[in-house]
Amino acid sequence: MSEESLSDEMMLNYHLMHPGGDSRPGDPNLAYYVNGTYHLHYILKHRWCGPQVPHAPEGESFSFVHVTSPDMINWTWQKTKLQPSFTGHGMFSGTGFITKEGKAAGIYCGVSDPRQTFIVTAEDDNLDVWNKPYPVLPKGGPDGKDMRLVGDPDLFTVGETYYAYSASDDVQMCKSKNLVDWEYVGPLMKNGFSGVAIGEDLSCANMFPFFGKWMLLNISHFMGCRYYIGDWDEEAEQFVPESHGRMNWRRPEQSLENPEYRDFFAPESVLTPDGRRVMWAWLATIHPDVNLKTVQSLPRELSLHEDGALRIEPLQELTSLRYDRVAYKDIVYTVNPSAETDILDDKTVRGTQKIADLPGDSFEIEIVIERSRAEGKRFGFHIFADDDNEGLFFLMQTESGTIRLGEVEAPFDLSDVPSGEALRINVFGDKYLVEVFVNGRQALITTFMDYNKGQELRWYLFAGGMSFSANIWDTTAANMHIRKIDIWKLKCANEGLVEARDTRVWEPDNN
């Protein structure tokens, strides 16, 4: 790792991204932890002069680029093995799993004729040698015909039985004892679950045991990343969801009639050796200048709280990037009623105040506020700000139970935070990409392409309902006490990205 930021303005410092220029799609796939190494694959569309199949892009195909890491932060690109010159077809989304024999394996959608699902197994722990893939051909189906697994298949294990299903708005499932002989089971889960619109598909799925429950991480193509949490009914061989939540949030400029909210998309996860469930998501529509860069979100740790709610935290290993900490304690910020720039009208005031200079374009900020001091207030902060630039705005709207990062707004109810727990906001800045985590209960991500115009962190506090003509000043509303603010520089972890850009070791064959 280096303390120097990467000089290429579009090349991020510690987010995983493709080194080879424009590429789309970039779904993360086939994630494993094997013998001390994390393995992740992602889809790469590339030039292909070999045999063409119907409904595939002319002169193009799809491969799984392979990256490895000791810590899910520092990545090394490997030679691409799962590609059409080996498989005989293009490769689209699926899931990695470990067989009962302890081998890394994958189930995926083959860009083949006919389009169908394949299984591929690794011969070695480095994932350098793979066996030839073979199709999954279940017997039986809901209409008396043999069912077909086609798009975005997933596979999970219950006891000695493998279960598999593929993308659909009516997901059907099959099972096998040996990954070769498959038989139809029935629907994966109940239909008509509350909080889900009729017509939302279930794609890019990843189902796994989760803190005594089961989690079904997935997308709908129009609403982006989401999840179900529930139980596995062993007798019915069916997933019984108990709750549903979203991880992707609409921006104002996106259509309501044709919603395509894909900023946080196509998730994949892995189980660490110490029992943590870690996920990534492809940032598919995050910004026009970024959409073709195949950028992945920060790794997020998922857990289940005793109240049944999902917890989302940044990967613990990210703390290894921190250095040159600057700490501020017991900050009392007061809106200044005499400052003309603070007065919006005769009864409404807002204020912004510089707190610190940002330490470059790679940083983490942690802000801690006592819950009682935040209740009922609208407040937040600007990053990349100065006297001439507002920067990127984060807003906590306790009165409406929402938080906002730039144009992205998501639910967050301060009353859900126990009275003895402080409000904790973690901000990760990586050049133009910003991710914010709030108390492990919500996470937002956005871009800010003018990140280099301002280099200040500024605090914001809204205060209203004050009568200046009567010299009445509500000091409770106009003050904010911040317990602490910590700011760290973050080291650059993308030396492997630079090396792979130059060597192009990952580049697939074109025929």
Indicate where each model-derived feature is located.
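Beta-rich accessory regions
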Residues: S2, M223, D233-Q254, N258-R262, ...
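Surface-exposed loop/turn positions within WD40 beta-propeller blades
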Residues: S168-D170, L179, F222-G224, K431
